[in-house]
Amino acid sequence: MNPANHSQVAGFVLLGLSQVWELRFVFFTVFSAVYFMTVVGNLLIVVIVTSDPHLHTTMYFLLGNLSFLDFCYSSITAPRMLVDLLSGNPTISFGGCLTQLFFFHFIGGIKIFLLTVMAYDRYIAISQPLHYTLIMNQTVCALLMAASWVGGFIHSIVQIALTIQLPFCGPDKLDNFYCDVPQLIKLACTDTFVLELLMVSNNGLVTLMCFLVLLGSYTALLVMLRSHSREGRSKALSTCASHIAVVTLIFVPCIYVYTRPFRTFPMDKAVSVLYTIVTPMLNPAIYTLRNKEVIMAMKKLWRRKKDPIGPLEHRPLH
């Protein structure tokens, strides 16, 4: 097909999860609850980490940032998906599609780099506990966080730069509930073989490099923990287990989607729902379920909300 003979499409039709109204209503009900829990769970962690002085440490600073990013990440796709499920008219403009694509990869890239920073933080905390506060000081922490944001921005800009030059002259039906590279690139009315290689290389490089760093960090930690006491080993494994669970939930779907040729497989939409909608909801529960410090901070916040003036004996007499 010669793109010169066809006009550029004004937008795309998102095919979504289903065309059947009854199924769309069920999906709307379920994912509304999931998104509500995502917002409440992640923002609650941000509030707790910010308000409790005992949690003003590097580990909880990074956790608070991850929760904020999970809230943003889910908000890029979930609200629009919910509206489209009810409206039955899931169209998105070309500019809106590129905007969603940019922020999706921007926040997603930051999360990938941040998880790598969190693994490094745990490695230093366990391998060099006496020097931990010197190595992971506020300046280093801020620089690593800034590097994660810059890395996410560069990664996203590459995606946009490679996509925006493509001619889209029809068809305009995008087989997903949000705009992403694998589905979008298949609608281009030109040969995209070289472009697919570039995008797979870019996504694969970011994902696999970070995953290998994480794998190396935790392999070294597991070897190191053999020499620790039972109590120290148990506490370290508890912290690492939470992080490994989150890493698995994020990296495995990303590797499945972005490090292979852009072809459609039956599991694609289910995997997309997992890492864009479900995983951001699970992360707060995974990190707080066995974390005594966060649970204590939650209880303090709840008591403060119930009794904002303070205990009866400390109230002023009038």
From Swiss-Prot:
Its localization reads: Cell membrane
Which PROSITE patterns does this entry report, sorted A to Z?
G_PROTEIN_RECEP_F1_2 (PS50262)
Q: Which residues cross the membrane?
A: 26-49, 58-79, 101-120, 140-158, 196-219, 236-258, 270-289
Recorded GO cellular component terms are: plasma membrane
Q: Which segments sit on the Cytoplasmic face?
A: 50-57, 121-139, 220-235, 290-318
Does the record's keyword annotation contain Disulfide bond? yes
Residues assigned to the Extracellular compartment are: 1-25, 80-100, 159-195, 259-269
Disulfide pairings: C97-C189
Q: How does it sit in the membrane?
A: Multi-pass membrane protein
Molecular function terms from GO: G protein-coupled receptor activity; olfactory receptor activity
Where is it chiefly localized? membrane
Q: Please give the family membership noted in the entry.
A: Belongs to the G-protein coupled receptor 1 family.
Protein name as catalogued: Olfactory receptor 4D5
